Amino acid sequence: MSCKVGFWRQDVAVLCDWEIKARCDKNSMVVPFDPELLNPASLDVLLGNHLMIESIFSPDLIRVDISHYTEEEPYRLEPGEFCLAETVELFNLPNDISCQFVLKSSRARSGLNHLLAGWCDPGWHGSRLTLELKNERVHHAQMLYPGMKIGQMVFHAMSNVPLKSYAETGHYNNHLTVMPNVA
């Protein structure tokens, strides 16, 4: 498809629950797709099994498997600590849909912060979303475990298909786990 330069459609919008479901059912936009995670204008996403954390011994982030942690015995993100995390869900955005990650308000109110790199361009595919998380609390750890609701994705219908899709130009396609900077 090509973009019609100079043509403006008035139907640009955030997708509602039934539109998200239809896209996921038809195009595998989110895998796995659980309709129980639908909200009126977003889809909840879950924390995956891998983190990347800082080490005092190396400037590089170290990959950590947290699959054995549970709600009863969670991973502790200590005060001021930063980590990269991943979603359980794999995303396959068509060329006419973009999306944005937003931290669940309950997580934000507990002092967890997402550091604002949550935009996903049309055509981004075959990848789990990497999250940049920081514990903003001073005295208490944040408890993290696989499968917890961490945020929600808001999907945007594009006014037109872009001239260049992220499928052609993106660095972060086809990444099945948390990814550090590859630019």
What are the residue ranges of the model-derived segments?
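DUTPase catalytic domain/fold
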Residues: 1-183
